[in-house]
């Protein structure tokens, strides 16, 4: 792929990397490193889109390529934005809050065209319904260490799959990148 037409994923997430690769897209990876704190009063979707945009633009300033994809996934339950848990106790708290109630998984993504200095930003929302969880289920899952680098303290594609009754919306969005939407937007922008 010519230097001036490369796609760069601005993320260290192995799940995003796997999803994008599964679509047969050639891309490079250049992890972004930006603060991930909401602005007081910021709506959850706006927060995730802002982070995605910041990741894409910051990565473009530090690396070669043409199109830069930034993404950020959050879980929202009863108005609380849940990012990655701080520790095991925080993971237990999050999973107890999600137990038996619907919540939203929001992935904001941004595709930045460095050559044209243009950006496309969107948020995709998927509703997830957890079954009621027993304390011992939560404790055993947290003990695996799996929840520690996941928004909302769970990975739908892993051991938490048995906690989910159903979803309304994009499965890949819950994993970390709404693949259908991202691929379509890459096509629209001329990257594919």
From Swiss-Prot:
Its cofactor is a divalent metal cation. It catalyses: dTTP + H2O = dTMP + diphosphate + H(+); UTP + H2O = UMP + diphosphate + H(+). It is an enzyme of class 3 (hydrolase). It is found in: Cytoplasm. GO terms for molecular function: dTTP diphosphatase activity; UTP diphosphatase activity. Coiled coil: none annotated. Keywords: Cytoplasm, Hydrolase, Nucleotide metabolism. Its EC number is 3.6.1.9. The record marks 15, 73, 157 as: Important for substrate specificity. The active site is at 72 (proton acceptor). GO terms for biological process: nucleotide metabolic process. One of its GO terms (cellular component) is cytoplasm. InterPro entries: ITPase-like_fam, Maf-like. Nucleoside triphosphate pyrophosphatase that hydrolyzes dTTP and UTP. May have a dual role in cell division arrest and in preventing the incorporation of modified nucleotides into cellular nucleic acids. Belongs to the Maf family. YhdE subfamily. This is dTTP/UTP pyrophosphatase. It comes from Geobacter metallireducens (strain ATCC 53774 / DSM 7210 / GS-15). The lineage of its organism: Bacteria, Pseudomonadati, Thermodesulfobacteriota, Desulfuromonadia, Geobacterales.
């Amino acid at each position: 792929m010519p230097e001036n037409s490369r796609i760069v994923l601005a993320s260290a997430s192995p799940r995003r990397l796997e999803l994008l690769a599964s679509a047969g897209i050639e891309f490079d990876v250049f992890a972004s490193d930006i603060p991930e704190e909401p602005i007081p009063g910021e709506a959850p979707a706006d927060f995730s889109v802002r982070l995605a945009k910041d990741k894409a633009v910051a990565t473009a300033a530090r690396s070669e390529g043409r199109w830069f994809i930034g993404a950020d996934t959050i879980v929202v339950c009863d108005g609380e934005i849940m990012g990655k848990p701080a520790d095991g106790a925080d993971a237990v708290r999050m999973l107890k809050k999600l137990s038996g109630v619907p919540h939203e998984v929001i992935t904001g993504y941004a595709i930045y065209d460095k050559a044209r200095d243009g950006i496309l930003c969107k948020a995709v929302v998927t509703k997830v319904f957890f079954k009621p969880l027993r304390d011992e289920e939560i404790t055993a899952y947290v003990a695996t260490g799996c929840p520690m680098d996941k928004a909302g303290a769970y990975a739908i594609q892993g051991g938490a799959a048995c906690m989910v009754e159903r979803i309304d919306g994009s499965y890949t969005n819950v994993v970390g990148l709404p693949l259908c939407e991202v691929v379509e937007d890459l096509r629209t922008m001329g990257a594919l």
